[in-house]
């Protein structure tokens, strides 16, 4: 898996392992939690009373995780330094009545999640993974990581104009994957199949949150293998970098003036409005309870929040060699050119001048370059959890990330060096 580079590729090798182990947000937070556990962090339950103890802690809620490290002697009003990211990616998700079919084909009824590049999901070997809710109230993760499903494209002989007029897909009729032959009801019991896969008794599963994923593993690409192709880089690349950075800072034993935090949310791709999304109460609740657990008052909470800074880390757009005119003519982020700072004067990104200075200082300390992304004026600008975090919590927030190609494809493309550079910048930010 290793590739030659002027930089250490160990981080990128580990990213590829993380991507493969994290086909869903639920698996992603489990993977992050396992890495933090190895670094000495421990899980705390939201239903328990929290103690005023130092060290690393984390909260899991669905497909979200908030982790933080309290240094020895931290005051109740000690500010936070937060790395924010999201765990979800566009895909196809299984409907409540999953079994369907037609003309002798067994199919799975799916709904489109987020804004995927749907052509990238056609004729691709897909697995199925997610969370099963059981009759006893517990949950179980499941991952069928082998070719199970496929959305077959119509042959060109039956769609003669596809190459000249473009691919046209009806979201309801054309995207239901096949997974075998037979009667859709008698032979197509998907949940029974998953119960067998998970080693559960029939009828034990009473609810599910299931989604498709490409089973093709991440891989180095190019003559010098300076590129990485893989799924869910938007935005597990940032989740992985943030997890590694937080673990590194906690292990350093340094005298920290801030409490470093990782907040990885679900549902960014659909607006963040959920109890596990950035527009929900999770982050604010964790930060407040951390202040109060250390004997703080509401005044201490206000002081801590006033001094807090968040880096909202999400992937951005590298200049595309075939579509360079879609970019701002004076801002062309390049692959392996270092992390990007995202700016939009209409507050689609949260970055302002003071935020730029914070990120520039972190990159200077880490001795790495950074680039700036601004949208072409003639095209709408996307957004992130950054403006939501700034507005909801009154926290100074800066939008950053790594430039990639093919964002929202089933298989995206990044530079092999950029993930490592991002992680180094995050370490320097969390440990100024």
UniProtKB/Swiss-Prot annotation:
Record EC number: 3.4.11.-
Q: Name one GO molecular function term.
A: aminopeptidase activity
Q: Which organism is it from?
A: Streptomyces coelicolor (strain ATCC BAA-471 / A3(2) / M145)
What PANTHER family does the database record attribute to this sequence?
ASPARTYL AMINOPEPTIDASE
Recorded protein name is Probable M18 family aminopeptidase 2
Q: Where is the signal peptide?
A: none
Obligatory cofactor(s) = Zn(2+)
Q: Which SUPFAM superfamilies match?
A: Aminopeptidase/glucanase lid domain, Zn-dependent exopeptidases
Which residues are involved in binding Zn(2+)?
Answer: 86, 157, 408
Q: Which Gene Ontology terms of cellular component type are present?
A: cytoplasm
Q: Keywords in UniProt for this one? A: Aminopeptidase, Hydrolase, Metal-binding, Metalloprotease, Protease, Zinc
Task: Identify the InterPro entries for this entry.
Answer: M18_aminopeptidase_2, Peptidase_M18, Peptidase_M18_dom2
In the record, biological process GO terms are: proteolysis
What's this protein's family per the entry? Belongs to the peptidase M18 family.
Q: Which Pfam families match?
A: Peptidase_M18
- Which enzyme class? hydrolase
